[in-house]
Amino acid sequence: MSIQIIKQGIMDTLQDKGRYGFQHIGIPPCGYLDYLSAQLANVIVGNPKEAPIFELHFPASSFIFNEAHTICISGANFVPVLNDKSIALNTPIQVCKNDTLHFMQPLLGKTSYLSIKGNIDSSSWLNSKSDFSSQLKTNDQFNIIAWDGDNKINSDKTEEQASHQCNINEIQKHIFNSNEIRFIPGPQWNDLTNESISTILKQPFNTSLNSNRMGYTLKGPSLQLIEQKGYLSSAVT
């Protein structure tokens, strides 16, 4: 096997673009939680942008590589360490046989992605390899197989990939380091007082521990309604 989990994390899974078209019968689409970071990690190693990828949350899983590979880590910064050396995000990294990968602490962000050049060999269901009922466990092993048309898994394009590092850094600077969130006002927006609307637009909020794949719960200044009322639950899109 090409890669093995030597210590499981918390709710780490294998994800791809997800399975759509089955929500009407109660099957969740799953898929990347942070679509942009997952696609970026895949593209950097030369994979199709919607290829399967390891989605990690802190404390994250630890890995051992049984073969040489090209990897990339994107998304949240959990201080990735290859053997005893810290490695950069959004950068193609060459790993050797018996190298180990650990994540030390959550510095920024909630979800990180580990991409490996090649196709992660895992069972597919309804045209997707995304997990929704299981997580990565200690001693899980995965083969990494070449894509059709590739002669070998290991990348020969590290220099070419590195030449695009300036563009990657610009993406990281303008997107991943931004603390601003765009939003579309919903039906309840006009029920808020003017002071509360101003608070939302001007005051900082943090994500709470109650956040999950259905959505983020924010914690910050309290908000007030013009008129106290209750709300029925509504669809999530």
Model-inferred region functions:
Residues M1-T237:
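Conserved "landmark" site that anchors the functional core of diverse proteins
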